[in-house]
Amino acid sequence: MDFIAILIGLGPLLGWGLFPTIASKFGGRPVNQIFGATVGTLIFAIVLALFKGIGLPGGMALVFSLISGAGWAFGQIITFKAFELVGSSRAMPITTAFQLLGASLWGVFALGNWPGITNKIIGFLALLVILIGARMTVWTETKQQEYSKNLRSAVILLLVGEIGYWIYSAAPQATDIGGFKAFLPQAIGMVIVAVIYALMNMSKGNAFKEKVSWQQTISGFFFAFAALTYLISAQPNMNGLATGFVLSQTSVVLATLTGIFFLNQKKTSKELMITIVGLVLILVAASITVFIK
């Protein structure tokens, strides 16, 4: 593993780590955030396709790629709604934990990962540690009824949103399409869902004409940059799938800390310390789930 590979592997740290913070900083409603983010991703995907000469896939590969992108957009809409309740610094560790659980369980029961009793025990213990780590990141010294209510609502929302993220990762596996080939149709699927969602919310304002929607395209560039660098990092001649995945998960640390310090989502010193320990537990346990043979 060389220096260039590590740099590329840390691309998702910056892209996915800053994406929720930038989206929250620009503000607006979830409809503005999802519309701008998906348009930004589509622009990035079109430029990449033109640069590399990648055309749209055909047949079921196209269908499943579109479904994949639609799943992500659904999950991200739900996540943006959770941001409104508890802030990105608290929502991101939870949704990351749920995504890790979803991906791991799918791998075990559908793809045959973690063969053998010992590996399964280690894997499920690691998943338990991930849940404990996520719980630590939302711990508060003062028990406020409104916060507890919002947190419960956010957790339920993020559980529902995990369905979309699972579709995003699982749908392309139904075909042999590569990540680069799927990137553009995934972005198209994202935009389709965002446009439908915007049309459904026209009574609350025209997201297509609101300035903040177009400002949010910048957040989409960050998401797309992360997705692209992850695809490159996961290639065998770079970091490989397992190491690339672990490096990409460091984004939850940046997303959480930038939410705390740049979005003024304040924590006490004790809460911050426990949050950091929780993040470390999530990263360590996530690494274990990937490297189980």
Curated annotation (Swiss-Prot):
InterPro entries, per the entry: Sugar_transport (IPR010651)
Q: Please provide, alphabetically and separated by semicolons, the GO molecular function terms listed in this UniProt record.
A: carbohydrate transmembrane transporter activity
For whether the record's keyword set contains Transmembrane, the answer is yes
Record keyword Cell membrane present: yes
Query: What residue ranges are annotated as transmembrane?
Result: 5-24, 34-51, 58-80, 95-114, 121-138, 153-170, 177-199, 212-234, 241-263, 273-292
Which Pfam family is an annotated match for this chain, by its short name? Sugar_transport
State the annotated membrane topology for this chain.
Answer: Multi-pass membrane protein
Give the record's keywords alphabetically.
Answer: Cell membrane, Membrane, Sugar transport, Transmembrane, Transmembrane helix, Transport
Question: Can you list the GO cellular component terms from the UniProt entry?
Answer: plasma membrane
The places in or outside the cell where this protein is found are: Cell membrane
Which family does the similarity line name? Belongs to the GRP transporter (TC 2.A.7.5) family.
Function, in words: Could be involved in the uptake of ribose.
What protein name is recorded for this chain? Putative ribose uptake protein RbsU
Record lineage: Bacteria, Bacillati, Bacillota, Bacilli, Bacillales
Q: Which gene encodes it?
A: rbsU
